[in-house]
């Protein structure tokens, strides 16, 4: 009887996510030559594409209101230039309002910030698109000697606006 009870307990534990027992994803992660620290209340999630080097979730008012934060680094000679990526990101929105592009220098590194609101056309390039109205993009392109790093946060406008300062702090911290 003791063996059956032990087996049952093991089987039940296997059904639960073992991360509930203290295993927490690392707070620091490296993309290209930069080591980033995820904001404390953001969640590390498994990347959903081989093109993504890291993926986070910024919380919203509820789970359906969270924003997706993705990191890309394509390696030397790949990924396109800053202008091409800014244009592509802006092109992912219909009914755009308030598009902003700003270049800043952090410790001799150029960072191009992109911000746009409107209807985000979610989906893989060349594939079907799903319109997501009342959305916002906050993006950053970090210029690097080893090729640019691209960071893009998309989600409901209120969530992205609320996470903007944490996003900028996360992007700029490895440059200081």
Placement of each model-derived feature along the sequence:
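Secretory pathway targeting signatures of secreted, lumenal, and periplasmic proteins
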Residues: 34-93, 102
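Cleaved targeting-peptide boundary
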Residues: 21-29
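Surface-exposed amphipathic alpha-helical segments
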Residues: 36, 42, 145-176
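Solvent-exposed, acidic/flexible segments
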Residues: 64, 78-82, 131-134, 144, ...
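Bacterial N-terminal signal peptides
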Residues: 7-19
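Positively charged n-region of N-terminal signal peptides that target proteins for export
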Residues: 1-5
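Signature of long, low-cysteine stretches enriched in small and polar/charged residues
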Residues: 40, 50-53, 86-142
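Solvent-exposed loop/turn segments at secondary-structure junctions
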Residues: 76-79, 118-122, 156-160
């Amino acid at each position: 009887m003791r063996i059956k009870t032990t087996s049952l307990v093991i089987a039940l534990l296997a059904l639960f996510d073992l991360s509930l027992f203290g295993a927490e994803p690392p707070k620091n992660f490296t993309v290209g030559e930069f080591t980033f620290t995820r904001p404390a209340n953001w969640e590390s999630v498994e990347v959903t594409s081989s093109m993504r080097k890291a993926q986070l979730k910024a919380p919203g008012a509820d789970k359906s209101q969270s924003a997706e934060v993705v990191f890309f680094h394509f390696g030397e000679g790949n990924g396109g230039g800053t202008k091409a990526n800014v244009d592509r990101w802006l092109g992912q929105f219909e009914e755009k309002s308030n598009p902003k592009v700003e270049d800043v220098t952090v410790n001799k590194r150029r960072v191009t910030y992109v911000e746009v609101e409107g209807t985000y056309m979610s989906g893989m390039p060349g594939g079907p698109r799903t319109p997501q109205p009342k959305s916002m993009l906050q993006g950053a392109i970090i210029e690097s000697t080893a090729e640019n790093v691209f960071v893009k946060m998309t989600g409901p406008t209120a969530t992205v606006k609320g996470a903007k300062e944490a996003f900028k702090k996360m992007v700029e911290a490895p440059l200081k």
